Amino acid sequence: MPVPQLLEVIAKVNKIHKDIQNSIQEKLATHSVLDEELGNPAYGPATKKHLVQVSSILGLLQEYNLLQDDTCFVELGAGKGKVSYWLAKTLELLRHSSSSVLLVERASLRHKHDNKLDKTDVSVVRIRADIADLLLPEIDTIAKAKHVVGVTKHLCGDATDLALTCLMNCQSSGKDVTGMVMTFCCLHRCHWNTYVGKHFFEHVGINSVDFDIMCGLVSWAVCGSGQSREKRKNDESGLGENERYTQIGLNRCEKETVGKKCKDLINWGRKIYLQNQGFNCDLCYYVNSNITLENVCIIAMKANKEV
């Protein structure tokens, strides 16, 4: 892309971000249901990092009083079901026999946790569906529940926006979507047509072209320089990496900061969207960055619900 256009978007990002800087606070939670598992010496660093994230998600659900009975907990993009497994164990310990867990995943995966899930006392249902086509109120598990709570762990790119839209459509149908805890991933895979924060971006002067550029700049936050992707583009344009840095006037540390600001703004737009739908929201760092660089989550709770 032309360097002047890139610099123009970076200038917009820096200006807009000033209004939200320091608004994303650290909120590191844990849940006792995973204490023993986290202490298992047989697990390596990768497994423990995953468990730390799950523990924080469950801890936040508890802290925000979202672990209530007669609730269907919907894990969107459930993968192999590891989050849902520990969520079901938590509900079992709380003796929430009227609650249920619904796993939604479009892929057919091997080595799922479903056999373990079947051994819990909590009703667990897995459906294979694309979130874009999902009508939650038509699912029996949802229809029977008094409340609905959404959960995601590292739902990729615009799948998060599709999940938010899905949950808000569920609310519009008359179901009580009490709240959600959603962690983000791969913001470079977001798309303007599905992004829920368009109203916020248009209000602050970001258009669809700017948004696409921002999604590219996000890689600077999670890859440092975004070198592999950028190197291919530089090779095609005849620009070396150092020359590209010279033209935009940013070193690697400054580029990483720009990438993080882009991530913050994309997630902030999602927060504003949920607030406009009647939710109180916190955008926070739910684990340390040494656990994962994708360490931001949104916690949303019905505005009339008490913690």
Model-flagged regions — what are they?
Residues 1-307:
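Class I S-adenosyl-L-methionine
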